[in-house]
Structure formats: C-alpha cells, structure tokens
Amino acid sequence: MTGENFVLPRRLDWRNLNTLWGSLLAETLSRLGCRLAVVSPGSRSAPLTYALAQHPNIEAIPVLDERSAAFFALGLAQQTRQPIPLVCTSGSAGAHFFPALIEAAESGWPLLVLTADRPPELRHCRAGQAIDQVKLYGHYPNWQAELALPSADPEALAYLRQTLVHAWERTLYPFPGPVHLNVPFRDPLAPIADGSTAPLLHLQEDPEFEKTFFRGVAPPCTGSSLQAVRSPFQTETVSFWQEWRGCERGVILAGPAQPADPQRYVEAVAHLATALGWPVLAEGLSPLRNYASLNPYLITTYDLILQRDRPQLWPEQVIQLGSLPTSKALRQTLAKVAPRVWRLDPRPDNGDPLHNPTTHLPFAVEEWVAGIPEAPAKRTTFLQGWLTAEAQIRAALDQAMTDLSEWFEGKVAWWLAHHLPPETPLFIANSTPVRDVEWFWPPNDRRIRPYFNRGTNGIDGILSTALGVAHGSHKRPTVLLTGDLAFLHDSSGLRLGQQVRGSLTILLINNQGGGIFELLPIAEVGRQGPDPPFEPYFATPQLVDLALLCQAHGIPHRRVESWQELAQALDPLPAQGVRVLEILTDRKADAQRRRDWFQQWSELPSKP
C-alpha cells in the first residue's frame, strides 16, 4: 500500500502548533504501519497522547505505571514483530522505561520511545518535572534524537515527517531494537485554538495538501524481502562447509530463538544437521523441541549428559545458532574443551561469552542452508553416542515424571508440553521456570510458541510483557509460566488485566521465595552461622496473600490442588480475560529432588 492510494479523511489538527505536531506524528506513524501504541498519562505528553488516542487506525492503550507500560509494549513488539510507540511525560517518567528498553536492545525488539519534554528554557532551572532527557538511554537505542520545537514553518513539518520515517526504519533496520525521540513542547498543551498555526493557513485550506504531503510515507520493506537477496554460500564460505563436512565430531547448538516462521527455522536446522550428520543440542526456548519429528538428531537432555565427563561426546567443532543455550553444564564443557566455533547470527553482537576460537558468520540459518547439498551425511559413532545417551536419559526422565503424583516444579514444565493446545503462545519467566523448561521440556510436535525475555535475563516486567503478548495474539489464548517473586515484582501489571484484549492464563508456581538460589552454592554457605542470611537476603520469602492481591485487581484466582484439576483448568483455555492458577510447592524439597534425579540420570551409560 502506497501513500498515493492510502485515502483517508483529513487527519491534521490545526488548532495550535502542538496539536498539529502531534497529529502529524500520529498520521505519519499510521501510514508507516503503526496500529498499536502504549501511552502513560501526563501533561507534557498531552499533544502526543491526544493525537494517538484520536487516530482511527491506532489503538492507543493507556498504562499508568511507566515500567509496566514499557514491558507491555515489549510484549506487543514480540508478538506483532512491529515497532510499538511508547509515550510518557517529562521528568522521571522516561527513566521507568529504561529496563524494558535495555531488554529490547539486548534481545532485538522494535520500540519507538517518545519522551515528552519541557522546552530548553525550562530545563536545568528547577522548573519542575524536568530532568536531562537527551540521550537518556545511553548507547542502547539503535538511534536517538531530540526533535525541534513545533514551529509554523512548512519545512519544519517536512522535517518532522522524515525524522519519524527514519526513526521507524531504525527500529527495524539493520537490526530490530529501540529508538528514542525526545519531544519538547511549550504551552498550550491542551488542544485549544490559539492562532499559532495562522502562518500555515494556506496549507490548511489546500484540499490536496495532506495527500501530497504524505505521498511518500508507506510501510518499509519487510525483513524477509531484504533477506531474500542475500546469498551467503559464496566462494569464500565454501571452505567453511568443507571443513564442517570433514569433521565427524561436530555439534549444532540451538539457543533461545523466536523466529518469525518457526517451521522454516526448524527445517533449516534439520537440513544442516542431516547434511553434516551432527547432533542438535536444542535449548528449551528454541522452537526445535516443539517440532521434534522434523529433526531426527535432536538432543534435549544435553545438560544432564554433560554433567559427567564424557570425552567421547566432546565436540571438535561447533555451529552456534544465535545465543548460547542456558545450560551451565554445556558452557562448562565448551570452556574446558575449547572447540572451534562458528556462530551463525545475523546480529553483529559478540555472542561468545566463553571466548573460544570463534568465527562470526552474519547470516540466519535459514539463509545459510539455501546453498548446501541435499545429500545426508553418514551416521558416525560420535552422533550415535549422543543419540543413545539422549534416548536413555529421556526415557528415565519421562518415566519419573509419569510416575510422580505430587507437585514438583520441574514436572509443571514437562506436563505443559504434553497438555497445552497446539500452537499455544507460552511466556516463560526467568529464574527457575526457564531452567526447568531447559531441563524437563520434552520433544513434541505441538508447535507451542515460546516467548521470553532473555536479553538481560531479569525477573522484572515478566507479567506486563506476557500481557502484551496476550493482547497482541488475542485470537489465540496465551499462558504465562512464572514463579511467585517474578509475579510480585511486576504486580503493577495486574492493573492491565481489565484492558487486555485476549486471554492470559497465569500459571503461578508459589514456592515462597527464590527457588533458583536453592540450586546455587550460596544455599549451603548462606545457612551457616548464628544469623544465617540465606532466607532474608536470597530466598526472600514474601508474605503476600496472592488471592487477595488478585481480588483487589479484579483478576480471578484459583489454587490448583492436583494434576487432574490443572488439566481441567486448562481444557479449554478461556478465549477472553486474565486469570491466575496458583500451585503451592516446596522449594527446598524440589531442589533436593532435582539434585537427586540429576545425579541419577547423569550417571546412566551412554555407550553407543
């Protein structure tokens, strides 16, 4: 759709310069493809808020808490894969966007942050609600600028339009991420006529002005159309392929991934694996585990396999897709063995925290496999060793989960993979849930779509991000798997529960504190001495009645007592609304159970 045939009624608001500026911004964003925006309340941002709220093609969602608003926008960006404008007033409001903006930068999601500001003459003079907002977010944005003050100049209108076009494009290219525009306004902030646009009366009276003015504004080229022209399999890369084909002790590492087309991604990895005859060690946050039948060399229990030294399974070469998997045992093995690493990742970041001998190949795996041979490689002893170990440990793990009747945090992840409806969007919180998914999530063919915040790996903003995913995928019910601390840390997100268009079921594992610390050395050391610090400073149990907290926000809450009751609660998932299903677990007992099982399973033989 082009600017010429994008026919709309007149959109510009000429009552004053600020309304003109705001309406021009909203109309430009609309023509670029914007359909959702997130707005936190405030006076200085009124011209932006009013314009976005009034635009018929943009759903402007009001969110009181700026931190929650920013993570909600991040969830919308993850689900829609489109830039989401995020608006706040001047002062400290924009600082609350920072955690989500960092996550967007680190994980590669497009946000267009619009911080309203006082004009320059009211800064650095204690005018109130004013801080230095220029380059507020340091080096994290893909691009950042301060807009000029609104002025009655035709060239200024063109400047604003093109700056917005550039800002929108920079949220997407060359790699998705946040962009920050600082937007100053003088009074009047309300949409009242003051005659300030009189010098532009000739434009206002021209019936063709808007059509002519916006004729070049249209959604930018999609990422897929840009990638289609890239052909990595050239002469200089054929040598890489020949080196891989000559190696019988290679592995493919598939880290966390949220590809636009999961099946295409999985098929590309399977093509690469079968052509090389290499096992694929797939992170629980990778779509590979949810399309298991497409990849015959899939390994899901590698963390348990590598908890014991098995030199016969150590790789000489590694193809790493994106970031490393979460597994600590895998990272320790790679650090010890120091294999030759080839990292396939279109992003330019340094993705090798182990500092192994690594070559960065700046391509997506879907691009790379387009030119490789179709003929599968033979099965090697090395590959068979991995497949045998996987089969043995997976069988023991699955049997243990099947036989277990009481609550266990790890079984929740395993159970969801067997019971969630196909293609369910599942947001997985950081800390213990993401590790239980890594350890226990089985291979399946349910095409479940994992969502997560693994850019900075924090527990902040989990609920709000999941609500954003649910709002963006409103035609398909969404599930959030979270612990009690992550839930409480972002409890202000509960206020969004009445606004979400769609469905979110929050599966809340309440183990009265930070269960992840029970698995770390601090759990043993921190319980020693006359005044042990572990419980108050690390486990940090919270005495909050979660049912009453949900009730205060109008969110239905239910404590689930059995696996059968959980199955009934999830079949079917509701089509609308937010609800909490709480499961009470014992973090100390569950931590010990993990340790016992991990020791038992990791000692299983793995000889081919």
UniProtKB/Swiss-Prot annotation:
* Gene3D superfamilies the UniProt entry points to: 3.40.50.970, TPP-binding domain
Name the pathway it acts in: Quinol/quinone metabolism; 1,4-dihydroxy-2-naphthoate biosynthesis; 1,4-dihydroxy-2-naphthoate from chorismate: step 2/7; Cofactor biosynthesis; phylloquinone biosynthesis
Tell me its cofactors. Mg(2+); Mn(2+); thiamine diphosphate
Recorded family membership? Belongs to the TPP enzyme family. MenD subfamily.
- Cofactor: binding comment: Binds 1 thiamine pyrophosphate per subunit.
Annotated Gene Ontology MF terms?
2-succinyl-5-enolpyruvyl-6-hydroxy-3-cyclohexene-1-carboxylic-acid synthase activity; magnesium ion binding; manganese ion binding; thiamine pyrophosphate binding
Question: Which species is this UniProt entry from?
Answer: Synechococcus sp. (strain JA-2-3B'a(2-13))
Q: Specify the protein name.
A: 2-succinyl-5-enolpyruvyl-6-hydroxy-3-cyclohexene-1-carboxylate synthase
Question: So what EC number does this one have?
Answer: 2.2.1.9
Q: Does the keyword Manganese apply?
A: yes
Keyword Calcium applies: no
Q: How does it assemble?
A: Homodimer.
Q: Name one GO biological process term.
A: menaquinone biosynthetic process
InterPro entries assigned: MenaQ_synth_MenD (IPR004433), MenD_middle (IPR032264), THDP-binding (IPR029061), Thiamin_PyroP_enz_TPP-bd_dom (IPR012001), TPP_enzyme_TPP-bd (IPR011766)
Q: Which reaction does it catalyse?
A: isochorismate + 2-oxoglutarate + H(+) = 5-enolpyruvoyl-6-hydroxy-2-succinyl-cyclohex-3-ene-1-carboxylate + CO2
* Functional note: Catalyzes the thiamine diphosphate-dependent decarboxylation of 2-oxoglutarate and the subsequent addition of the resulting succinic semialdehyde-thiamine pyrophosphate anion to isochorismate to yield 2-succinyl-5-enolpyruvyl-6-hydroxy-3-cyclohexene-1-carboxylate (SEPHCHC).
Recorded hits in NCBIfam families, A to Z, give:
menD
Which residues form each disulfide bond in the chain?
Answer: none
Keywords linked to the UniProt accession:
Magnesium, Manganese, Metal-binding, Thiamine pyrophosphate, Transferase
Please give the Pfam families that the UniProt record associates with this protein. TPP_enzyme_C, TPP_enzyme_M_2, TPP_enzyme_N
